[in-house]
Design a protein with these regions (language model features):
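A short, surface-exposed loop/turn module that caps and links secondary-structure elements
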Residues: 33-59
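Amphipathic alpha-helical interface surfaces
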Residues: 5, 24-31, 45
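Generic recognition of well-ordered alpha-helical segments
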Residues: 11, 30-33
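Enriched for short, Lys/Arg-rich terminal
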Residues: 2-4, 11-25, 50, 58-90
Length: 90
């Protein structure tokens, strides 16, 4: 699947590039690759979100941060919405 990034996710990627520890940056790279290959399974504890975030998925980068993304199967696209903080922190 193709990966696209929202403007907020692009800002988060830049933040990680400038401020992130190597372990987290490497994990983000691995998780994004996995998401492109199989968005609903794999490492980072993929989780379908519910309530006001229904239709979105998350994967753990570390204890505090998550990748939040949407799977648009009709377009064969994964839209990454966020790469920092926990979804309840937004």
């Amino acid at each position: 699947m193709e990966i696209a990034y929202s403007p907020d996710a692009q800002k988060d990627l830049e933040w990680w590039r400038l401020n992130g520890d190597e372990s987290s940056k490497n994990k983000i790279t691995r998780l994004i690759q996995e998401i492109s290959e199989h968005p609903k399974t794999g490492t980072g504890k993929p989780e379908a979100l519910s309530h006001n975030l229904a239709g979105l998925w998350s994967r753990r980068i570390n204890k505090k941060d998550r990748i939040i993304y949407q799977i648009l199967e009709d377009k064969i696209l994964v839209l990454v919405l966020s790469l920092r903080n926990h979804y309840s922190d937004k």
